[in-house]
Amino acid sequence: TLSTVNINKKNFKWTTDFIYSHAQNKVTSLDNQQRVIDLVAGTGFALEGYPVRSVFSIPYKGLNSEGIPTFLDQDGNVTSTGIYFQERDKIDFLEYSGTADPTDFGSFGNTFSFYGFKVNVFFTYSFGNVVRMDAVFKKRYSDLTAMPKEFKNRWVVPGDEKYTDIPVIASSTQEFNDPNLAYAYNAYNYSSARIAKGDFIRLKEVSLSYDFPQ
């Protein structure tokens, strides 16, 4: 914690308060075996050698020529539908994306006093964590679910896989030819393509007050 008086004159005063915290942890021993689905969930899960709330991802390997996402599976093969979410033994293929808990966080505020008026501007900040983006992709959509903003950049025609990572909206033919197509979209939702930094600086409060002369 750091507090400073930047300016202190008869009718004007400016003060700053700064709070900083750093948190770090590591699981050194763990008996139970986690499943793939536990480790790729955005809430974070424990794995020996990593932070308590670690987030892992299925390695994304791009779209194929039909706009279907592909991944590296537990056997080292590139696949669209071969990810087994209940796997407990072969989990080393997963990518460590980061921790769900921020490692650096705190707040800072400035207070300005001028002829009885007082203005307070307060910010909070948080850095070092990752978030799993919403699981919005699936093999079939309704009018209510086909609304993610990412769809404007989706795969549409062959060759688009060179420029986008957003899967195709599957056709009825694709659904018929691959009854396991839903697995590809589910894996995409939990892949390295759907990870984002959770860093933020947020304006938390702005207040104005006045102290009447006594």
Language model features with spans:
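Transmembrane beta-barrel architecture of outer-membrane proteins
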Residues: 1, 13, 103-107, 200-207
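Outer-membrane beta-barrel architecture
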Residues: 1-3, 17, 59, 109-111, ...
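Transmembrane beta-strands of outer-membrane beta-barrel pores
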Residues: 4-6, 20-26, 114-116, 125-129, ...
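Conserved small-residue
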Residues: 5-100, 140, 151-168
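Core subunits and conserved enzymes of cellular information-processing
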Residues: 9, 19, 40, 105, ...
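Transmembrane beta-strands of outer-membrane beta-barrel proteins
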Residues: 14-16, 108, 114, 119-121
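Short sequence motifs at beta-strands and strand-loop junctions characteristic
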Residues: 50-52, 98-103, 193-202
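Extracytoplasmic gating/loop element in the C-terminal half of outer-membrane beta-barrel translocons
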Residues: 127-214
